[in-house]
Amino acid sequence: MAGHSKWANIKHRKAKVDAQKGKIFTKIGRELIVAARQGGPDPNSNFRLKIAIQKAKENNMPNDNIQRAIQRGAGGTEGANYEELTYEGYGPGGVAIMIEAMTDNRNRTAGEIRHLFSKSGGNLGETGCVSWIFEPKGVIRLAVTPEAGAKVVDEDELMLVALETGALDIAVEEDEAEVFTLPEELEGVRQALADAGYAVLSAEVTLVPKNTMEVTDKDIATKLIKLMDALEEHDDVQNAYANFNIDDAVMEQIG
């Protein structure tokens, strides 16, 4: 897909994510609270909540935790002071970065995010400086190899099935496939792919870059990975998006 960034795939490779379940649960819980507060506790009529619940289950979040977060949000008590903010900036090498955050103290969060950018050689920018590079899309990740009897992905067949169900495009990598949709078509396409026998790993609305930068310099690549790791590990950051690919040879050098 034009503009598709492999950074999402690079993120999924990180084994240390398993050691951060507590932090992941906190971030997902925050999303559940805000989604329920804004759209109500019924996922059938609240698409944002439905996606958040799916993400919680994909990360093996206990059902009791999910329900407690929804009840807190629907009750309008806890989580009422969370503010949703978007930050934009440039990382090492001029890479565009978008950050979605939830915070109870915008001054603290802005200062800490600005520090992370500066430390990496990048800079936090003004609103609108890089948002035009990204567009919201539904992204459905599929297992490429058989999982519990699910269908093996054949690229040509998947393309036909995906387009018939309303998808925009697909990207097939060695370890997984991705199907891209309009945000409002995400759930319908996800269900159609599951009904067709594919193993759906995740489905979410995300920001996809319209164009990408190929990073071939090891030093810049290392700084970018450290910055993205630091952003994603920040307590207030829900999502971090960037428009770069790292050359395979450079990734091998980094290890």
UniProtKB/Swiss-Prot annotation:
- State the protein's name: Probable transcriptional regulatory protein Helmi_17570
Any single GO CC term annotated in Swiss-Prot or TrEMBL for this entry: cytosol
HAMAP family to which the protein is assigned, alphabetical: Transcrip_reg_TACO1
Source organism per UniProt: Heliobacterium modesticaldum (strain ATCC 51547 / Ice1)
Coiled coil where? none
Q: Name one GO biological process term.
A: regulation of DNA-templated transcription
Cellular localisation = Cytoplasm
Family recorded in the similarity comment: Belongs to the TACO1 family.
Keyword terms of this UniProt record: Cytoplasm, DNA-binding, Transcription, Transcription regulation
* UniProt superkingdom: Bacteria
Q: Name one GO molecular function term.
A: DNA binding
A Pfam family this chain is assigned to: Transcrip_reg
Major site of localization recorded for this protein: cytoplasm
Q: Among its keywords, does the record have DNA-binding? A: yes
Q: Does the keyword Transcription apply?
A: yes
